[in-house]
């Protein structure tokens, strides 16, 4: 048997977005809905009857927006022939303690949804562990072919490219599970060796510029073989960042124009001084390395004087100096304390 899995949907109001004319929805809600329905159609077209969401259907934690809840419930109703398995993610909850309330309580009355909240649940060879204050213990003590959960892993990578220290690492999972399917980190990624395979399915759309250029996807899993197939998600506006130099200027401008015609968000980044002439049509930012050595900053200077000189070098407006200085000095005090 095969199932489809996604996660980190992050339905919210997105009131600051432009309204998509065809649906009268904020742009991100429109894109999320498109991606969800494309996944539902994929299930129908490929005889898949089980659809799993690995946490974070909602975005705003203790706030439930009616427009977000309506899209969620309409989706489950539209695909009434599918069986959905849903676990809580951290954004679905009002907190992490035992008194946390889930924003997914409305799923109790949805006949084709199995909602798993609070404690772990086992179905055949699948072990579902929702986000909770005791999830780490449940995962370390559990055992199954397939683990489905929502947490950060030591070896996982954020969209920024860094890893953070977490309560779980690969050594806690090897020997207990063959395949691990996770929500929580939005960057699609996998860690695979001969003993275990771990996948962060990633968010189905690029939710903001922090997820720029990510190849978003959903996964299709064979429960008998634990084989995983990655399928690109479609139907959403992408955040595309293009780095431009004098040597690739013509090609980058062409790519930017094509992406804009397709309705995507486009940012052009200048990595060297280059005359583009497209600043009125595109978001253009400058990321040029500048030499700040030997500019009058010496070891004998006070911290305040060093910071002030640095702000001058970086051409920060003088009106902003006091604000930046306060933050920098506060940070130094905390580190030295």
Outline where the language-model segments fall.
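Extreme N-terminal starter segment of soluble prokaryotic enzymes
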Residues: 1-4
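Active-site glycine-centered loops adjacent to acidic/histidine catalytic or metal-binding residues
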Residues: 8, 55-56, 89-90, 150, ...
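Accessory, non-catalytic peripheral segments of nucleic-acid enzymes
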Residues: 45, 222-337
């Amino acid at each position: 048997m095969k199932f489809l899995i996604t996660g980190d949907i992050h339905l919210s109001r997105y009131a600051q977005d432009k309204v998509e004319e065809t649906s009268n929805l904020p742009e991100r809600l429109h894109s999320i809905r498109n991606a969800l329905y494309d996944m539902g159609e994929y299930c129908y077209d490929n005889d898949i009857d089980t659809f799993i969401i690995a946490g974070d259907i909602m975005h705003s934690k203790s706030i439930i927006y009616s427009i977000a809840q309506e899209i969620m419930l309409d989706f489950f109703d539209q695909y009434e022939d599918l069986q959905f398995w849903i676990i809580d993610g951290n954004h679905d909850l009002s907190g992490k303690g035992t008194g946390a309330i889930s924003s997914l309580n409305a799923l109790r009355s949805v006949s084709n949804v199995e909602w798993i909240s609070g404690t772990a649940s086992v179905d055949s060879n699948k072990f579902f562990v929702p986000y909770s204050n005791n999830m780490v213990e449940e995962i370390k003590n559990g055992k199954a072919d397939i683990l489905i959960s929502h947490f950060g892993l030591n070896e996982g990578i954020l969209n920024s490219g860094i890893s953070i220290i977490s309560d779980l690492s690969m050594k806690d999972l090897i020997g207990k599970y063959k395949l691990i399917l996770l929500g929580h980190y939005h960057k699609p990624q996998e860690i695979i060796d001969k003993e275990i395979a771990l996948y962060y399915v990633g968010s189905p759309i690029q939710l903001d510029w922090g997820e720029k250029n990510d190849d978003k996807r959903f996964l299709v899993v064979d429960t008998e073989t634990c084989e995983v197939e990655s399928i690109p998600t479609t139907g959403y506006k992408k955040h595309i960042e293009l780095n431009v130099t004098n040597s690739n200027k013509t090609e980058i401008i062409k790519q930017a124009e094509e992406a804009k015609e397709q309705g995507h968000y486009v940012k052009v980044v200048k990595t060297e001084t280059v005359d583009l002439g497209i600043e009125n049509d595109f978001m253009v930012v400058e990321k040029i390395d500048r030499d700040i050595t030997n500019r009058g900053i010496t070891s004998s200077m006070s911290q305040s004087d060093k910071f002030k000189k640095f702000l001058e070098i970086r051409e920060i407006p003088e009106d902003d100096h006091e604000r930046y200085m306060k933050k920098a000095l506060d940070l130094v005090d905390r580190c030295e304390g």
